[in-house]
From Swiss-Prot:
Name used for this protein in its record: Tyrosine--tRNA ligase
Subunit structure: Homodimer.
Chain location of the short sequence motif 'KMSKS' region per the record: 239-243
Role: Catalyzes the attachment of tyrosine to tRNA(Tyr) in a two-step reaction: tyrosine is first activated by ATP to form Tyr-AMP and then transferred to the acceptor end of tRNA(Tyr).
InterPro entries for the chain: aa-tRNA-synth_I_CS, aa-tRNA-synth_Ic, Rossmann-like_a/b/a_fold, S4_RNA-bd, S4_RNA-bd_sf, SYY-like_C, Tyr-tRNA-ligase, Tyr-tRNA-ligase_bac-type
Keywords: Acetylation, Aminoacyl-tRNA synthetase, ATP-binding, Cytoplasm, Ligase, Nucleotide-binding, Protein biosynthesis, RNA-binding
List of residues binding L-tyrosine: Y41, Y179, Q183
Organism encoding this protein: Escherichia coli O1:K1 / APEC
Subcellular location: Cytoplasm
In-chain residues carrying the UniProt-annotated modification N6-acetyllysine: K148
One annotated Gene Ontology cellular component of this protein: cytosol
Length: 428
């Protein structure tokens, strides 16, 4: 389903997908793209040990440009991650130690790698780290060579920091205020090193991107461009990319492939076709045809399954997708025989509620401990009414004690009350 976007009208195609929030000098950029391949970059600051769904749109945008023949540079902010971007943040960020940030840099670099092709000839991707040019820069060089080109008058008028400057309880430190200069210099540096002429980022990055464009012009007399992707919103106004458990991460150890897949399955009908444009490489024609088919089928829409499949495969590969589908199918059917030990580990991580128990427990106690029932008395009635299954098998004896064979892989027992209420027992 992957499409190669023709370079000359790449911006138009991104706009058709709703992927362009703002762009500097669109005509000149379109003209530059029409002349042949360019190098472009997107920065990822290590503010945690994993990227999350919010990073996925700009990351996939880099991939879209690479598929159209351009050279992507993925910049991990080993230096900027030590400072903290104040853009549209209500409060000062907590500074992390150099060791922590370095650890996160390594993890994020590994996470970005599978999305881009680092070995495809002319337009092979490049991984860069801005610590390489800031790590040994002394303060006088910074103030004379970079600071001299920035007007504080303009900096305090940038939307991204305005609200912080106007709040008495939360000012802005000189550290975070100077972030804008660092990101600006990144652009100038990458322009000089790799001929980068375009920076892409989330729409909250507009102020930092335009600073980089100005600085590159002043330092190298080169015209460069910026393009921002929109911050993703949901039709109901709630925040995208969050669940009750917090952010949806790209690291399978922080959000399991099953939970990730389920996140997309639960997309609202009002959002799903838009999200297919943002997060997949299906053509607009394919997406429109799917929408038409769903509208006329008289059945539940297929779009959520297509979306979940495409994005889970992109992020977790074919194995991750197959595991997520297998777990989904087994929970739905109640038959657990196809589940592997690793599948149960995903469920224990974040797939269903989990409770740890000592061996020798009885079923009534398990139902109370797992909060599937409020009391032993209520548990007794529910068991007797034939509403409880153990590993998919009905159990109607209220006095039941767990046996060795109930412990799958010696560790796991899956309880279900009714059709949909699960709890996984992990035996100590």
């Amino acid at each position: 389903m992957e499409i190669l976007m023709a370079s000359s009208n790449l911006i138009k195609q991104l706009q058709e997908r709703g992927l362009v929030a703002q762009v500097t000098d669109e005509e000149a950029l379109a003209e530059r793209l029409a002349q042949g391949p360019i190098a472009l970059y997107c920065g990822f600051d290590p503010t945690a040990d994993s990227l999350h769904l919010g990073h996925l749109v700009p990351l996939l945008c880099l991939k879209r440009f690479q598929q159209a023949g351009h050279k992507p540079v993925a910049l991990v902010g080993g230096a900027t991650g030590l400072i903290g971007d104040p853009s549209f943040k209500a409060a000062e960020r907590k500074l992390n130690t150099e060791e922590t940030v370095q650890e996160w840099v390594d993890k994020i670099r590994k996470q970005v790698a599978p999305f881009l092709d680092f070995d495809c000839g002319e337009n092979s991707a490049i991984a860069a780290n801005n610590y390489d040019w800031f790590g040994n820069m002394n303060v006088l060089t910074f103030l004379r060579d970079i600071g001299k080109h920035f007007s504080v008058n303009q900096m305090i008028n940038k939307e991204a920091v305005k609200q912080r400057l106007n709040r008495e309880d939360q000012g802005i430190s000189f550290t975070e205020f100077s972030y804008n200069l660092l990101q600006g210099y990144d652009f100038a540096c990458l322009n000089k090193q790799y001929g980068v002429v375009l920076q892409i980022g989330g729409s909250d990055q507009w102020g930092n991107i335009t600073s980089g464009i100005d600085l590159t012009r002043r330092l190298h007399q080169n015209q460069v461009f910026g393009l921002t992707v929109p911050l993703i919103t949901k039709a109901d106004g709630t925040k995208f990319g969050k669940t009750e458990g917090g952010a949806v991460w790209l690291d399978p150890k922080k959000t399991s492939p099953y939970k990730f897949y389920q996140f997309w399955i639960n997309t609202a009908d009002a959002d799903v076709y838009r999200f297919l444009k943002f997060f997949t490489f299906m053509s607009i024609e394919e997406i429109n045809a799917l929408e038409e088919e769903d509208k006329n089928s008289g059945k539940a829409p297929r779009a959520q399954y297509v979306l979940a499949e495409q994005v889970t495969r992109l992020v977790h590969g074919e194995d991750g997708l197959q595991a997520a589908k297998r777990i989904t199918e087994c929970l739905f059917s109640g038959s657990l025989s196809a589940l592997s030990e690793a599948d149960f580990e995903q469920l224990a991580q974040d797939g269903v509620p989990m409770v740890e128990m000592e061996k020798g427990a009885d079923l009534m106690q398990a139902l109370v401990d797992s909060e599937l029932q409020p009391s032993r008395g209520q548990a007794r009635k529910t068991i007797a009414s034939n509403a409880i299954t153990i590993n998919g098998e009905k159990q109607s004896d209220p006095e039941y004690f767990f046996k060795e064979e109930d412990r799958l892989f010696g560790r796991f027992t899956l309880l279900r009350r009714g059709k949909k209420n699960y709890c996984l027992i992990c035996w100590k």
